[in-house]
């Protein structure tokens, strides 16, 4: 487990870290498997692999809690979030206020295949099922012990389960293929830098149908003929 001590650059990051701490607390209380996914997890992976100074920084104000389908339908999940002051807004979004901060947790489930399945009724939630999340849940997590220094001087300690960088890449390349945003492209670049720094090779890539589809998308959109990623120092070509 890596130990990180990070300064928050903004109120938005304060909110994301506070929400992430709540995600970890809920998972520990219920004793369920989860991965913290999305922009905040990618940023933490760049610090875990020691490359944050080489890649673009990106702020996010929310925390995405990726969990197996049975956890989405767990009748204890909603009370656990509500006991921490969260109010449900929409099918799978939970919000609480901490002073002037608005903390947001989105609960996400794994899609069975390579396509996003929006607004799926599971238990009492209407959940987006995300392609690649199952791969991220099956791979061992990257556990980090974080001391977050918030902008008001508060120190917040937490232990977080991040996706393996390969799982994070699978998640993010599917996200890019679904919406083609510069933000997602930059995140792919950050994760590729982390994967190279971590010593991962082509033979380490998950050989599942979803893993192979993600590899195809990486080659298609981020191969040797693809322009440099927006805001990234990542090279133009990759062995994957």
Model-predicted segments: where are they?
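Compositionally biased terminal segments of proteins
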Residues: 1-240
